[in-house]
């Protein structure tokens, strides 16, 4: 009995044994935590003193009727899985064994997977529908010759959007897996920012946004392509969600905490209630999609920064612009290879 108690008390799962009359025979302390029981239950008391939810009761009743039962119990943001199995003795149901698991993280991952799948389906469908509709109009000869370049331009634009989306999904998948992203090297954040702003100059010109780079050399350890993704997506977002005659200021500097890059814009800003969600996949403050993009840029920043052990900070007010800062570990700090 002492060995049995020692084993069950060291389990993170809840373990509970009841008899045919639903009386508690034994349980470990994890049961109280996982079933949100306010006070311990004495042996011989009804198991329903631990939890009175309908799902829990159904599981107990099914097991005592001779049928194995699984049930999810949700409370606030927590999720528990109840697995109840009948116990037979001399051909009769003598009771049941219940195992309670904390599956909160598993269910959250599954929810995120479902949301991601639904979002991907929607985001892919939009440009594909546009491409198909335009192609059908061209195929049926419903376009004047002089209008063909315009319709062809629509197809080209939507195709580029589709390719961008697929590329961003691939990047996020690789970051999720965390391996095979490339060799770690010493990277100059200032040089990366300079190259990115040069690359984005045409986009900034189209949006009538001026860009400025200030600071100096700041060396970090990381995968060059992934560090570039961080800088590119920060600057691209700052330009895309800016206003005409707005500005983007990129500051690169060394601090006591480590190399830091800050991207500040004079754009539309982010409402306070949305600031906790802007790093989610496909989340957009601009629901009209008028600013373009895939809705994955800041999610890539978040995951790429985490891969490098970097911290991300956001400051914003609606209508007053946004400032995002990424602070990398010092190059001599212990990090990935």
Whereabouts are the PLM-identified features?
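Sensory modules in modular signal-transduction proteins
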Residues: 1-24
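PAS-family sensory/regulatory modules and their coupling/dimerization elements
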Residues: 43-105
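Short acidic helix/loop segment immediately C-terminal to the autophosphorylated histidine
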Residues: 139-146
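Short alpha-helical segment of the dimerization/phosphotransfer core of two-component systems
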Residues: 157-162
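Conserved micro-motifs of the catalytic ATP-binding
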Residues: 177-183, 215, 219-225
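Short conserved segment of the HATPase_c
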Residues: 270-282, 302
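Conserved glycine-rich
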Residues: 309-310
């Amino acid at each position: 009995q002492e060995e049995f108690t020692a084993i069950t008390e060291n389990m993170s799962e809840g373990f509970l044994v009841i008899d045919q009359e639903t009386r508690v025979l034994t349980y470990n302390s994890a049961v109280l935590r996982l079933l949100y029981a306010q006070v311990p239950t004495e042996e011989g008391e009804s198991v329903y003193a631990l939890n009175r939810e309908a799902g829990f009761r159904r599981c107990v009743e099914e097991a005592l009727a001779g049928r194995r039962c699984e049930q999810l119990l949700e409370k606030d943001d927590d999720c528990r899985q109840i697995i109840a199995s009948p116990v037979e003795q001399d051909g009769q149901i003598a009771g049941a064994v219940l195992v309670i698991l904390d599956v909160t993280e598993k269910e959250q991952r599954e929810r995120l997977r479902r949301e991601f799948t639904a979002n991907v389906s929607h985001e892919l469908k939009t440009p594909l529908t546009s491409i198909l509709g335009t192609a059908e109009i061209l195929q049926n000869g419903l376009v004047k010759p002089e209008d063909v370049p315009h319709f062809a331009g629509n197809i080209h634009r939507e195709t580029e959007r589709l390719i961008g989306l697929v590329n961003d999904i691939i990047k996020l998948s690789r970051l999720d897996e965390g391996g095979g992203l490339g060799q770690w090297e010493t990277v100059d954040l200032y040089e990366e920012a300079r190259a990115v702003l040069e690359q984005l100059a045409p986009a900034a010109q189209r949006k009538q946004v001026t860009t400025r780079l200030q600071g100096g050399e700041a060396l970090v350890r990381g995968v060059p392509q992934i560090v570039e993704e961080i800088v590119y997506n920060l600057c691209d977002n700052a330009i895309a969600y800016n206003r005409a005659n707005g500005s983007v200021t990129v500051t690169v500097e060394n601090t006591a905490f480590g190399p830091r890059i800050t991207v500040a814009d004079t754009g539309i800003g982010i409402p306070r209630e949305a600031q906790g969600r802007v790093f989610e996949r496909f989340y957009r403050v601009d629901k009209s999609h008028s600013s373009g993009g895939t809705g994955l840029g800041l999610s890539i920043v978040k995951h790429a920064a985490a891969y490098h052990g970097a911290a991300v900070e956001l400051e914003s007010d609606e209508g007053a612009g946004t400032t995002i800062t990424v602070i990398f570990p010092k190059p001599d700090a212990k990090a990935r290879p």
